[in-house]
Design a protein with these regions (language model features):
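The conserved Walker
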Residues: 50
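Hydrophobic positions on the alpha1 helix immediately C-terminal to the Walker A/P-loop
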Residues: 57
């Protein structure tokens, strides 16, 4: 059938937190929670399937990063677009033709270089492989980092992070302090995006070595909105 290509169009003005509330992807209470988290440098992952709105939500919430902070973003395809003046965007580069790897600059190399720039916030478009280990090491040493990853729940997120090609040791997982689980679904025949859960990573059980989580928000399907739930600890 020949070659094909995909065009992903973006708004001239990126979606704002107010848009996320208007779309009912999140409630105003959840956005307020993330406002506090972003301003207080809480490392977080935005988790979901393809086209669930992970990067859109991450980009919208970045407006809450204090404007005087230095931000470095790293992507293979340019999607992050934030207004802060002290933002340094980084983009991966392919090799100089053919099968040669000469000249290739990947997310792993960009992330290592970014850590030498003394960033206060690091944004990685998506973690897929070796760059995730460097990102978690950065979190563990006090850097605030945000990224997206393909998974549909906290257990599947832990499974993806611990296994190849990402391969993060379980002892590093508590460096991640929270995650937002997003889904794409249909309501009355209309395709919508919803934040299914917002979960805090509490730590690791010293006896079972299971990851202890605290679910703060959960989407209530019956009212098509995100409601606050009572704190509930569980092991993953």
């Amino acid at each position: 059938r020949g070659s094909s290509f995909c065009i992903r169009r973006f708004k001239d003005d990126p979606f704002s937190p107010a848009d996320i509330i208007a779309f009912r992807t999140m409630s105003s209470l959840m956005v307020s929670y993330l406002w506090i988290a972003f301003q207080n440098e809480v490392p977080m992952l935005f988790v979901g399937g393809t086209a669930s709105g992970k990067t859109t939500t991450l980009n919208a919430m970045c407006i809450f990063i204090p404007w005087q902070m230095k931000i470095v973003s790293i992507e293979s395809t340019r999607e992050v677009n934030i207004p802060q003046p002290n933002w340094v965007p980084g983009l991966t580069r392919q090799g100089f033709g053919g099968e040669s790897t000469e000249g290739v600059i990947g997310e792993f190399e960009l992330l290592k270089a970014a850590l030498r720039e003394r960033p206060e916030y690091i944004i990685v478009g998506e973690i897929r492989g070796a760059e995730a280990y460097v990102l978690f090491q950065a979190m563990a040493t006090g850097h605030c980092a945000y990224s997206t990853v393909h998974a549909d729940s906290v257990p599947s997120l832990v499974h993806r992070l611990e296994n190849k090609p990402i391969d993060i040791p379980r002892v590093l997982l508590p460096a991640l302090e929270a995650c937002s689980i997003q889904i794409q679904t249909r309501i009355n025949g209309k395709r919508v995006r919803r934040t299914k859960q917002l979960v805090e990573i509490v730590g690791i059980d010293p006896n079972s070595l299971e990851v202890i989580t605290n679910e703060v928000f959960r989407w209530d399907v019956t009212v098509s909105y995100t409601h606050l739930t009572l704190p509930t600890n569980s092991n993953v």
